A protein has these predicted regions:
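The feature captures the beta-strand-to-loop junction immediately N-terminal to the Walker
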Residues: 90-92
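Conserved ABC ATPase signature
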Residues: 193-197, 201
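Catalytic Walker B motif of ABC-type/P-loop ATPase nucleotide-binding domains
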Residues: 218-221
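Conserved ABC ATPase "signature" region
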Residues: 171-189
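H-loop/switch region of ABC-family ATPase nucleotide-binding domains
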Residues: 254-255
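Membrane-embedded alpha-helical hairpins and interfacial helices in multi-pass inner-membrane proteins
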Residues: 1-38
């Protein structure tokens, strides 16, 4: 099954700062959290692997099983993410969302072990042919337990930490840090102690530290689970801005769909390790409703539209926000709510 949280924390630090990982790896193995065997090592170094789908990330017929697990966590999963996409991956707990995201960053198979069939390409790089440090220049990962990714005392030190380890000179570190902090609205806080930041600010700091490495893709694993409704709204405003203004490709594993709706271009619904459907938010939520898959995650407003349609009403616009819902209802009643002929 999944690794215990202590292991995930270590793996998370490994993704952002790979050299931290290796002492943790020995610890996990000695405590039997990670497998010594039941792992297929494929040396693809001599092969020329090319992705078959267009896209900044191409997941191709990926089947993956954690060490010693009886069932695959992912079963023949294929997904193409294009540059500039804003993708929400949703589904019940245990659907495979986190596993899919970790495969994009190369944490699967490099750090989790296990067996993998199929391939994942990130920025054209086959994840089995590149280590996580190579992939980190293309893809930035923010874990659900984002505080575990903070390893220093002040905001400025946190921003400099990974960049220093990449060997960037001080003036380049200052430039990148300043620009990244401004993008997440934390400018001027370099001297602040990390312990004085709110939960939302800590999360923004982790995002800024990842942005300073200038990746093309940002991956968030359930980023809003510890935030209040206002924090969730602010988070999506920030990430929506990074997608729109900076052109970053964004992939989020998420349960709270309502706040994501104004920004998401694509939804992906997972269940039991498979992708059930991917498409526009509206297409995917309709399938969730008609097939009774993770219905509880459908925003109340959109569910109200689907239920009104069941009794014969038609609407000009989907209820993706309150303004559209009000307009559509008023127009529908003005027409008498008749079904189109």
């Amino acid at each position: 099954g999944m690794l215990p949280m202590v292991a995930l924390v270590g793996v998370g630090n490994g993704i952002i700062t790979p050299f931290l990982y290796f002492p943790a790896l020995r610890l996990f193995k000695s405590m039997h959290y990670m497998a010594e065997s039941d792992t297929v090592d494929s040396d693809h170094s001599g092969l020329s692997l090319r992705q078959s789908e267009e896209g900044v990330i191409s997941v191709e017929h990926l089947t993956y099983t954690y060490p010693f697990a009886k069932e695959p966590a992912l079963k023949d999963v294929s997904l193409a993410v294009r540059k500039g996409d804003f993708v929400i991956v949703t589904g019940p707990n245990g659907a495979g969302k986190t596993t899919l995201l970790m495969s994009m960053a190369g944490a699967i198979p490099h750090y989790y072990g296990g067996t993998m069939e199929g391939m994942v390409f990130t920025d054209g790089k086959a994840v089995t042919q590149h280590n996580i440090a190579d992939l980190a220049s293309s893809i930035g990962v923010i874990l659900s337990d984002y505080k575990a990714q903070i390893v220093t005392l002040t905001v400025g030190e946190e921003m400099a930490f990974t960049l220093e380890n990449h060997g960037f000179p001080p003036e380049e570190i200052r430039r990148r840090s300043k620009e990244a902090l401004a993008k997440v609205h934390l400018e001027g806080l370099e001297n602040r102690k990390v312990t004085t930041l709110s939960g939302g600010q800590c999360q923004r700091l982790v995002v800024a530290a990842v942005l300073a490495e200038e990746p093309d893709v940002l991956v968030f694993d359930e980023p809003t689970s510890a935030l209040d409704p206002e924090g969730i709204r602010e988070f999506y405003e920030m990430v929506g801005e990074l997608n729109e203004k900076e052109g970053l490709t964004v992939i989020v594993a998420e349960h709270h769909l309502e706040a994501a709706l104004p920004y998401a271009k694509k939804f992906v619904l997972m269940n039991h390790g498979e992708i059930i459907v991917s498409g526009t938010p509206e297409e995917v939520m309709r399938r969730m409703y008609t097939e009774h898959i993770y219905e509880e995650a459908i925003p109340d407003m959109y569910k109200a539209q689907l239920e009104l349609e069941q009794v014969g009403m038609t609407f000009e616009k989907p209820f993706l926000n309150l303004a559209d819902a009000e307009t559509s209802v008023i127009h529908s009643f003005a027409k008498g709510g008749e079904k189109d002929a």
